[in-house]
A protein has these predicted regions:
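Short, extreme N-terminal segment that most often corresponds to the first beta-strand
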Residues: 1-31, 181-182
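Charged interaction segments
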Residues: 27, 38-182
């Protein structure tokens, strides 16, 4: 069983582009049963829309999606050396229907923040016009809060306050509410 990776994704583009990415996130496939019916990411277990897409001033739409996948966004939605994309493409080249965030961003912008607490890392990606504009990964840090509720500097992972582990979700210089770039 894999460690789960929680992600939050923002898609900006046409309603059709948003629907296409959602279809890839929610796709049901089994290469043991033959060719999948459409493009898909790998081992995405949940992709839930945060309400309806919101219309932007420029006529595009923005949709937030929350979900979880196996191990990392990198292994499930990208085409790197240790990705499901590469291994399935190698094992089933004749019926392969996998896709990546880069491929799906040809006519939209996609930004993803993820967190995998089992191995203690977080990811941040931005894709636009098929290009990766941001590929960041960092360790999940822990910290405390001062009396005003602002985060203090990072403290050791094993720091406890009484019986409570102090965990600080502040990484990539952002607060719990992600500072979206798209």
């Amino acid at each position: 069983m894999p460690n789960y990776c929680d992600y939050e994704m923002k898609i900006k583009g046409s309603k059709e582009a948003i629907a296409r990415v959602l279809e890839c996130l929610n796709a049901d496939y089994n290469y043991g049963e033959g060719k999948p019916s459409h493009k898909h990411f790998f081992r995405v277990f949940d992709a839930t829309k945060d309400g309806n897409a919101r219309k932007n001033a420029d006529g595009t739409y923005t949709q937030l999606i929350y979900g979880y996948c196996a191990w990392s966004v990198s292994s499930c939605m990208l085409d790197g050396g240790f990705s499901y994309y590469q291994s399935v493409k190698k094992d089933h080249p004749e019926i392969f229907m996998g896709t990546t965030l880069a491929e799906q961003s040809e006519d939209c912008e996609i930004e993803v923040f993820s967190e995998e607490p089992g191995m203690g890392f977080s990811e941040h990606y931005i894709f636009k016009n098929g290009e990766c504009l941001c590929d960041d990964e960092c360790e999940i840090t822990s910290g405390g809060y001062d009396e005003s509720g602002k985060p203090t500097e990072d403290i050791d992972w094993d720091t406890y306050e009484g019986e409570t582990l102090i965990f600080n979700p502040y990484r990539f210089g952002r607060t719990q509410q992600f500072l979206w770039n798209i």
